[in-house]
Amino acid sequence: MPFPPMPPPPAPAPGAQAARQLPRRPCAAGDKKKRPPQRPEGLLSSSWPSATLKRPPARRGPGLDRTQPPAPPGVSPQALPSRARAPATCAPPRPAGSGHSPARTTYAATSAGTGTTAAGTSSGAGPCPDSAARFCLNLTPEAVLVIQKRHLEKQLLARPRRPFPSPSAEPRRLLAPCLPARAAGPRRGGPASDPDAPPTAGQGRRAPPPGAQLLHGGLQVPQLSPRPGALRPMLKVSLLNERHRYDDVEYEEEPEAVDEGLVRKCTEWLRGVESAAAARGRAGALDSRRHLSTL
């Protein structure tokens, strides 16, 4: 038995369609709860490579260094160490998107005797380190000793030296005060004063000549040049040695045993040279050198 045709369903009203969609909202909410929550891209992931690849590079300000890590999100920029913001005082201001400013370092040198150490990043107080860059210099102990020795030598050379008297003028100056003393001896009626005689008890010690130098304690420096009278025997001895210097025993040579074979060969060689000189133009080259075959 065929079924009777069914009439089409009536068109629902707009209010009824909205009422039908309301019960679907709890189902949609249940589907969302089942799905895992999506993490934002800015947070760190569980794996280290994916975290470094997905994390966008942090933008650094003009005062931060390239090697300095970005500040954590919970720390304020005022809590950062002051050393990181110090180079910004010398570096010219740059726009925010231009990148980073190069780190500025200076090297402070200590004394040359103890070696030098390099300072870290420059502080903001003072002129810019680009104007006066200093470098460190490490010296070994041997180099320090060499530098100190040269410094002392320069100080000794810089001191003024006392002029030494010339040897030709020194005997004349020492003998000049002795001439009046010799001339004054016969006038007083006493014996002539002998400069080489020892002092008597009444006269006491002789006064040192004005040109003599005195050391501490009254010691007199011996004279450098002797008197002209004492030079004569020394001159005679030196002349005798110069004239007979080969007559000494140490210069005599002992007679040695003569090698007769060597004398014979030398004699034959000399005869061959004489015969070759006589027959140079007549004989050949080998005939003129007969002495070569005798050796």
From Swiss-Prot:
Coiled coil ranges (UniProt) are none
Q: Which residues carry this modification: Asymmetric dimethylarginine?
A: R172
Q: Which InterPro entries match?
A: PRR18
Could you tell me the keywords of this UniProt record? Methylation, Phosphoprotein
Q: Where is the composition biased (Low complexity)?
A: 14-29, 103-126, 181-192
Q: Biased composition, Pro residues: where in the chain?
A: 1-13
Q: Which residues carry this modification: Phosphoserine?
A: S47
Q: What residue spans carry the region label Disordered?
A: 1-133, 181-227
> What is the protein named?
Proline-rich protein 18
Task: Look up and give the organism this protein is from.
Answer: Homo sapiens (Human)
Supply the source organism's classification: Eukaryota, Metazoa, Chordata, Craniata, Vertebrata
User: What's the gene?
Assistant: PRR18
